[in-house]
Amino acid sequence: MSEILCQWLNQELKVSRTVSPKSFAKTFSNGYLIGEVLFKFELQSDFSEFSESRVSTAKLNNFSRLQPTLHLLGVQFDQNVAQSIITEKPGAATKLLYQLYIALQKKKKTGLTGLEIQTMQPQTNQRLQALKSEAFRERLKNLIPRQTDFNLMRVTCRFQEKCKQMKEDLARMHFEKFEKIQKLEEEQRHFNIEKQRLNRRRQNEIMAKIQAAIIQIPKPEPNRTLKAIEAQKLMKKKKEAEDVANEIKKFEALIKKDLQTRESISKTSLDTIDQTAAELLNTYSDDDYIKKIQKRLEEDAFAREQREKRRRRLLMDQLIAHEAQEEAYREEQLIHRLMRQSQQERRIAVQLMHVRHEKEVLWQNRIFREKQFEERRLKDFQDALDREAALTKQAKIDFAEQTLRAKEIHEKIAMERAQQRYEKHYGICAEILDQILDLCTKVADYRLLTNNLIPHKMMRDWKELFFSGNPIYEQTSHTHGQTESTEDHHVELNKRNLLDSKDYEDYKNMTGEWALPEDMANSSPPSNNNILGHVLLRLIENSYPSEKEVADTELPSFAVKGCLLGKTLSGKTTILKALQNDIPIQVLSIDTLVQEAIQAFNDGEKSSKAPSMHEDVKGDPEVDQKEMIIPQDKNELTDTQVPGEAAPQKEGTKSSDFEQFRPSNSFLSLSMRAQLGAKSELMLRRGKSVPDVLLVNILVNAIKKIPVNQSWVLDGFPMTVNQAKLLEEALTGYKRKSLQLKKKKAQMPTLALSPTTSKEVPFLPSAFDFAILLDISDNSSLARINDIIAKEISHEISHENVSGPTITSSEEKSEDRNLRDHIQHRIVGFLDNWPLLEEWFTEPRNILKKVNAEIDEAFLCQKIKEIFATEVSNKKIKVEKKLEEKETEKKSAVSPTEPPTPTPPLASEAEKEKEVHQAKPSGKGKTQSVSPKGKAQGGKISVKKSPIDSTEVSPTLIAMPTTKPGSEEWVYVTEPIPEELPSFLVPYWELIEKTYISHIKTVLRQLRESQHTVLSYLYETRTSFQEFLRRPDHKQDFVSQWQADFNSVPEDLWEDEETKAELHQRVNDLRDRLWDICEARKEEAEQERLDIINESWLQDYIGITMNHFFSLMQAEVNRFQDTKRLLQDYYRAMESRIPLEDNKKFTRIPLVQLDGKEISEHQLRIPLVPRISSSPENVSMRPKVKALLKGRFDPPLESLEANFEGDEKIVLDTWQQASLAISQMVAAEVHQRLAEEEKEQPQLDPKEKSPQSGTNKKAKKEKEQAKKEKEQAKKEKEQAKKEKEPPKKKMAEKKGKGKSSPVVEVSPVTITPEEMAEMERKNELKLKIKEEHLAALQTEEQATQFRLELIKSKALSILEDLVTKVIEVYRFMEKWLGKRYLNEMASIQKLTEVARYHIETATKIQNEIYLSQEDFYINGDIKVFPDPPPPTRPPPVEKEENGTLTIEQLDNLRDQFLDMAPKGIIGNKAFTDILLDLVTLNLGTNNLSSSWMHLTQLDLQEITSLLTVNTEFVDWRKFLMVAAMPWPIPLEEELLETLQRFKATDEAQTGTITFEQYKQAGLWFSGDEDIKIPENPLEPLPFNRQEHLIEFFFRLFADSEKDPPQLDYTQMLLYFACHPDTLEGVYRALSVAVGTHIFRQVETPMLTAEKTSISSVSPNEEFPEAEENSTREELKEEKDERDQKEEEIPENANTEKISMETLLKVFGGGNEVLDANRFASYLKTENIYSENLIKTFQDLGAKNLEPIEVNILLKHPYIQDLITNYVDYKIPDIKMILQRSEHAQGSDGERSPSRLTDEKK
């Protein structure tokens, strides 16, 4: 039944789902297919409301709609049946479908529809059915569970099934586990059983062997003779006797144990027991005891005999049998004992034989096992060889991969380093570029400020900032209240200091801005004050005396010191080993030294003299200060608890790993090397690297142990600059010496240079004589480590099965592996540190030598040896030269010790003081604080003088030196000075220099910044005045109002003369008003200019600038005063005179008072003068100012000129005042010198007369001298002051000493020649000091005067330049004002002319007239009244061209043909009649073009024949397509591309598209033509024919009956496949139908019949020759193309399949169409080729007409003939007929309508 229903549903009804018997209930459970079945029988009208879903709501909906229909058919259906079907109850759906099948078959027989059946039902039944349906729906809703409940139930069921499945899996797992356990137990039980079986079998075999070894001896028969019986009795008695003896032994043993408690039982041996018991008993010695035993034995024997008697009597028979048994047993025992020995021997023999057999088996087994061992060894050896080969191969692969990985890592690191270098270089370049841009923008800004004339000084400052790398623009403005300093502020301070230093250098050297002006070009700048420089240098050297140089008693060493550096594996150690073998040098490797130090600590190496920590460890200040304790045992290092180690370390404190050490006797007793090793081991145990300080200490300690004359070389050390510095400091102490050198250089004077070079610190020797770099590339280093590892791997693999390597080789391997792991880091570390190291070794003196280490090892060793030999020879030459210098120094030191004149021996200290008092007058006596040198030199003077000699010496004192002081030949006075004098004068000179430089820099900075202020002020003045001139005015308002009034005049009044006169008057009024505005603005501008000129800025700025230059003059004057005082104190101290009292009232240069306020004198710190010159002479005006003011009269500028002249006078007065003050100072100093000499001159006479009166009159002379000095001091000073206490005290002391000195008894002595020479020398010295002092003052005066004159010239030039710039700006302001006024007046004149022109021409002014500021123009962009609207352009109109039908005509023809024949096929006679009617009845209709109006009936018939399909019908669509030409004929490729676009647009693949889709896809040509828009707006646009043709083609081929119209694009493209060549057209149509290009199989000849027919119809004389030739050329080209295509046919061409329907669509021209009238509602079509095509398909093997390949189809003769003769795809040439008709009409004249009517009839 189910199969029948399935067949009915699937085949007859063809339901949407395939129904199978297995899924029948499930398929119909939702009721959808039941509704579909009813719908197919037109019973379920609401089938669209059915749902295919399986949810509860869908099922309820479906079955609720099914219930009325099933009830109508009489099928039994209620909620129970529905529930059964929904729940997929077996048989429910089948039963319902069977009932439905029967009911539908009945209905089918009746032929009634559902509506008819329903109408046949009574009305009451229908209402009742509606109620039943509603009730059914409610009941069914209650029966069917909700979808959510159903979903929950399904989820529950799913999880229940999952739970059940998990339980089953768990039970299965337990069962499997239990079975596994049972299986294991069973296997164990079987194993135990088998084991027991094997054991039993082995035991049975052993028992069998034993049994087989037993020899069975036959038992002899019992001997029943008396002799045998007696022997048995005897044996029984012996046995009893033995038993008794044994019992007795036991008893005696017990007795002995009781008697001898805790004693050892002595070994006793009893003699062999006799055969009888009596003999045994008699052996005991105790008689009583023996008697008792004998008695007891007798009693026992008697009792036993009685018992035996009774037993014999009672049991005689049993006794006899028992005795017999006993006898038999005894005999057996006896025999057994006798035979036991032989059995044991046989058993031993059997066992021996068994052992021999076992030995033989073991021997055979051993031989077999040895053979197996031999085979195994051979196999293992072969396996080892194979494994070694495999491991070697794998190791090579791994090593190659590792090498490649290491190379990639190295390349990556190199790329990163290159990237870092690039980024650094890029950053530097970017910074430089930014600074260049800043400089350019700064220059551009200041070109705007200065009118492209940037001051030279400003440009120099910017260049200086640019070259120094400082930003040109200001970074921040640091106000006075701001306290915190930022980075930008530091940058600004650095910039300011740089520019200040540059300005000071220019000022000092008189370069740049401070170069000599033209008026001072003839005067040379002052030279350096050599005397002052010498004085300062001597003071500095005395204030910081140089340390005494200790003479080296030892000879300099010939040892060469160097270091060998390079990358890892560059060959340093190898080269040094080879060098050490050939040359006696000591090689020091830091790694070896650290290991030896650690080993020394572990070995507890003791020091021989126990040095202290502070003496030995010099390079480690931390270790010197921190105490440490280290136990001797190395294991105690980790266990020792360091105090405070766990406490957190505070920030800012310097942590040191040696803080935990404390001094201990055990540690201090260690050697220095051991102590350093302890610290190194501690650092290494903590996982840290050994510090550089510790490494250097270890290295220095090792160097100290090397002999002095032995050379040494360091292996790979130092590695960083820090290590190099520490090593240099430890070996040479360069840091301390360099600091001394810097300190001494910092104290050298800068204002006065010494003529002689100061004693510099000698050149600091380096710690090394040479440093060699083994240069090697990174790749070579990596290649060497790879070679080492490769050799190591091969060695390991080859010796893997041999005994393990030694400890040394394992350590080397670990070192190599460690080196390989860190080779990249080492290379990178070397590359990072080497640039600084290279700079360290090459900066002071180049000791670095680079050697290429990638050469051969022997050649490299030879090269290093040559370098070392060269260094040894150089060192030898240096040492010999040094020795020669020392010898020469010793000789030169010995020669000056012998003076040319004899000197008296040195006296004692008391005698020295005495001589000093006698030789020196009280006014110039020396104090006690004179240096020893001074005392020694003063002590050389003798007190013994004669008056005669003194008179002879006096003429020699007047002699003058020939050399000039300060020159190169001048010998400077170096008399001793007091020790405390340099400590006062050196700081005083430093203060002078510091104050002078600071003052000069501050003033120059103010002048520099004021220059920027001037430029900014002048620029702001110019711009503000220009903006003032450009301020807005109200002229445009008046102009706009006038224009509005002018345009508002009516047009009819334009020609009136009175109106014109009125308009001219209005123009005049406007002009006058505008002139008034311009005059007012001019006056305001002039007042603004006067306000700017009358500002006090220029006067204030000139005053400030003058004060700056006066400050410079003050600085020079102050410096001169301070220098004069310093020289005075120095030379007076050298003459042992008392310094003069300090005069604090220095010369002050007054400044200019800027404002006119009067200030009281006590409020002034600096004197001020008014802006009025005190000099009466006139100062001539500068030429620049005079040139600017020449020929012009401007009162404000004249006032500026007068002010400038007064300022010049003030500058000159101030300069003269400063110059005069300096000259007066020098004159006063010279006068003071002369006065002192005059005072000293009279004192020479008393000394020469008699030295005796010196002791008595000494005090009086001292008092007189003091009074004279006091009066002289009062004259020189302005304020009277009392004498200071120190001079009084000194005089009192000298007076006291003079009184208390012992009176020497003097006799008249004549003056010796030596005393005369000493007096001459003293006078010469005084004269030399005076000359030197005055020369220094004069030189300083000249320099100061020159500086003051330079400042004066600079001040005047700057003031002149400033006034010139300001006057120039004021002149420009006047020029701008006048120019603007003239431009405004010219603009007003132009406006007046334009207005008068428009008045005279009587035209309005449409464009806006613009008059603003000084500009006048007519704005063409703005119109005051709108233009008239432009005329509208007419729509485009298509014109007839060359007889072509217009789009409108084509649409009219289409509408007529569509009404006549909607399917496109029309009879040829009807077609001809329609055309004839259109031609003859075209009066006023314009249905055809003019060229068609000349066609005759014959011509129309010829056109019809060209379009005829089957001699009866015409395709009017093809006619319209041809009539619409010209249009681009598509190529085959274009047709296929258009087809693909249509198919892509047709998503549903229905074969039809709408107009929107058609427009979206487009044809092979587009309607976007280049249309030229005509310039004339009244001319219509050109007509776009192609765009309209595309739309017309859609209307032509679309099915207009559908809404919206649908276009069959394949059918349309078949129309366009037509071609002038018939064969080409057919192939094009096939290609369009198939969708791909179809190649021609065979070449078919051209259809000549058609040509002949056409030629016969149209004679040659009717065709133009040009067209005929062009047609032939086109056909020839097409033929060539076709031939070329045929030649290019690929092998697998035309493999596409084509169906019968497609083929019939292509050859559809054979359809027989009946379309007799326009009212036919359908057409009857039949293709005449269908039968032949079906037969062709069957012939080709397609029995069921399935698609076949095109190439197979084209080979069939019928298809070839059909393609050759099918002419429907040829484009008919209608144009030829039209041209012929026009030609004939031109010869015959126009036809009349009557004639046409006759022809029609």
Swiss-Prot record:
Pfam family membership, one: ADK
Entry keyword set: Cell projection, Cilium, Coiled coil, Cytoplasm, Differentiation, Flagellum, Golgi apparatus, Spermatogenesis
GO cellular component: cytoplasm; extracellular region; Golgi apparatus; manchette; sperm flagellum; sperm midpiece
Alphabetical GO biological process terms: brain morphogenesis; cerebrospinal fluid circulation; epithelial cilium movement involved in extracellular fluid movement; establishment of localization in cell; mucociliary clearance; respiratory system development; skeletal system morphogenesis; sperm axoneme assembly
Tissues expressing the protein: Predominantly expressed in ciliated tissues such as lung, trachea, testis, brain, and at lower levels in kidney and spleen.
Region: Disordered, residue numbers: 632-659, 883-949, 1233-1304, 1651-1695, 1781-1801
Location within or outside the cell: Cell projection, Cilium, Flagellum; Cytoplasm; Golgi apparatus
Coiled coil: 176-260, 321-395, 722-748, 869-895, 1051-1077, 1252-1286, 1665-1695
InterPro entries reported for this sequence: CH_2 (IPR010441), CH_dom (IPR001715), CH_dom_sf (IPR036872), P-loop_NTPase (IPR027417), SPEF2_C (IPR056199), SPEF2_D5 (IPR054517), Sperm_flagellar-bone_growth (IPR052634)
Annotated segments matching region Interaction with IFT20: 1305-1657
Record field: compositional bias (Basic and acidic residues): 883-892, 909-918, 1233-1250, 1261-1295, 1669-1687
Domain Calponin-homology (CH) stretches: 1-105
PANTHER family in the cross-refs: KPL2-RELATED (PTHR14919), SPERM FLAGELLAR PROTEIN 2 (PTHR14919:SF0)
Function description: Required for correct axoneme development in spermatozoa. Important for normal development of the manchette and sperm head morphology. Essential for male fertility. Plays a role in localization of the intraflagellar transport protein IFT20 to the manchette, suggesting function as an adapter for dynein-mediated protein transport during spermatogenesis. Also plays a role in bone growth where it seems to be required for normal osteoblast differentiation.
Description of how the protein assembles with itself and partners: Interacts (via C-terminus) with IFT20. Interacts with DYNC1I2.
UniProt name for this protein: Sperm flagellar protein 2
Taxonomic source organism: Rattus norvegicus
Lineage: Eukaryota, Metazoa, Chordata, Craniata, Vertebrata
Gene encoding the protein: Spef2
